[in-house]
Amino acid sequence: MSALVLESRALGRKLSDFGQETSYIEGNSDQNAVSLIFSLKEEVGALARVLRLFEENDINLTHIESRPSRLRKDEYEFFTNLDQRSVPALANIIKILRHDIGATVHELSRDKKKDTVPWFPRTIQELDNFANQVLSYGAELDADHPGFKDPVYRARRKQFADIAYNYRHGQPIPRVEYTEEEKKTWGTVFRTLKSLYKTHACYEHNHIFPLLEKYCGFREDNIPQLEEVSQFLQSCTGFRLRPVAGLLSSRDFLGGLAFRVFHCTQYIRHGSKPMYTPEPDICHELLGHVPLFSDRSFAQFSQEIGLASLGAPDEYIEKLATIYWFTVEFGLCKQGDSIKAYGAGLLSSFGELQYCLSDKPKLLPLELEKTAVQEYTITEFQPLYYVAESFNDAKEKVRNFAATIPRPFSVHYDPYTQRIEVLDNTQQLKILADSISSEVEILCSALQKLK
C-alpha cells in the first residue's frame, strides 16, 4: 500500500520551532491558502510598488521569499502566501500585476476552486511542507490492529513516528536498533517470501535482490537501515527514501514520486501476525518496493505518475492513485511466455503472490482509461489484475494519460537542481530544447564512434 491513501481528509501538522525536535501536535493546516509566484524587473522600487498595491487592496501576506530568476537575468522571482480572506480581491490584483506592472504571475492554490491550480511542490526541499501531514500517527492504531492492545508496540510505533516527524530533507535517515522480536518478525517474512521470488517475481526484482543482499544487508537475521538502502537507490536510479510516520494523502504521496522520493515507513508489523499487516511497514517497503525502484525503467515509470499528479484536479488525482494501485502496488507484467508480479503489494504478500498467478483472479491488459476508474478492494485479495506489456509500454501510457489532464501547463523535472520546471512560456521551452539538443549531440557523437 505504501504511504498512499485514496481519501483526502483534514490532516494534522507538525509544529516546529526553528527546526528543533518536537513531537507531533494536531494543528490547523493551511490547506486553503493561496500562493502567488510573480517576477519583476530588477529595479529600484519595483517590489515596493507591488507591496503598496497589496496594502491598498487589503491583501494580507503571510509569507514572502525571493530569488534571482533562472530564466531572465534582469528579473527577480517572488513567492508569496496570501491569507484566504484576500481571495475576493485576488483577480483584480493579478490583472494589475500583469497589465500595469508587467509582472509574470502564476497563481497556486490548495482549495478546490475551478479557476486555480492546486498547490504542488516546486523544489525537493518543499516536501518538508507536507511530509508530516499523515492520516494516522504513532500509537494511534485501529481497534482491529494486531498491536492495538500491546502498549509496548504502541510506544515503539511512537518512537518511529517521532523520527519521521523530526526528519528534514538533506539529513541522513537516523539508524534504528531493532529488537530481537522485530528481527524475528522480519526473518519470518523474509524467508517465506524469498522462497517464491524465483518463480513468481519479475526479472527486474530477481536481478536486483542479490545486490541488495550484498550491499544493503538484506538478510534473514538483519533489518536493513533506510539510509544505506536510500544511498544504494540513489546510485542506481536517483530515487531516495524519506521516512514517514504513516499514510499520506494521494496528492502528497504522488508529489514525492515526481522528485524520485519514496515516502517510506520504518516500523515493522506486529509479531503476533508476521504474515499480515493492515498498513505498509518496512517489510512491504524494502521487499516489495525497493528492488523495483532500483530499476531504471520502472523508476522512470513511477516518476511519470508523480509528474502527472502535479497541479492535477482532485478527480484526476483519484484516477492516478488508482493507476498507481493497479501497477506499482498490484501490477503484473509479461516476460517472455510468462506473467510475473512486479507490484509491491504482491511481492510483500506470501498469500497474494501465489494467488495472483493462479487461475482464480481475472487478468486484463493494462488500459489506463479503464484502469483509472476500476474499483478495488483493500480487505482481501484483488479479484482482477492488470497486465502490462512492459515497463516502457506502461510509461508511455502514463504519458498519454497525463496529456488528458486539464492543467494549463506541462512540467519537467530538472535532476541537477532537483526542481520542477513549469513549462508555460516560450523562454522555458527554449531552455528545455537547448538541454535536449545538447543530450542529442552527445548521443550522435557516441553513435559515430561506434561505427
Curated annotation (Swiss-Prot):
For this protein, the activity regulation entry reads:
N-terminal region of PAH is thought to contain allosteric binding sites for phenylalanine and to constitute an 'inhibitory' domain that regulates the activity of a catalytic domain in the C-terminal portion of the molecule.
> What PROSITE patterns does this protein's entry cite?
ACT, BH4_AAA_HYDROXYL_1, BH4_AAA_HYDROXYL_2
Q: Where is the ACT domain?
A: 35-113
Subunit composition and interactions: Homodimer and homotetramer.
Residues where Phosphoserine is found: S16
The UniProt family comment states: Belongs to the biopterin-dependent aromatic amino acid hydroxylase family.
Biological processes, Gene Ontology terms? L-phenylalanine catabolic process; tyrosine biosynthetic process
Q: What is this protein called?
A: Phenylalanine-4-hydroxylase
Q: Which Pfam families does this entry report, sorted A to Z?
A: ACT (PF01842), Biopterin_H (PF00351)
Could you describe the post-translational modifications of this protein? Phosphorylation at Ser-16 increases basal activity and facilitates activation by the substrate phenylalanine.
Pathway-wise, it operates in: Amino-acid degradation; L-phenylalanine degradation; acetoacetate and fumarate from L-phenylalanine: step 1/6
Alphabetically, the GO molecular function entries are: iron ion binding; phenylalanine 4-monooxygenase activity
* Lineage: superkingdom: Eukaryota
What CDD domains does UniProt report for this protein, alphabetically?
A: ACT_PAH (cd04931), eu_PheOH (cd03347)
Which organism is this entry from?
Answer: Bos taurus
From the UniProt record, list the reaction(s) this protein catalyses.
(6R)-L-erythro-5,6,7,8-tetrahydrobiopterin + L-phenylalanine + O2 = (4aS,6R)-4a-hydroxy-L-erythro-5,6,7,8-tetrahydrobiopterin + L-tyrosine
Q: Which UniProt keywords apply?
A: Allosteric enzyme, Iron, Metal-binding, Monooxygenase, Oxidoreductase, Phenylalanine catabolism, Phosphoprotein
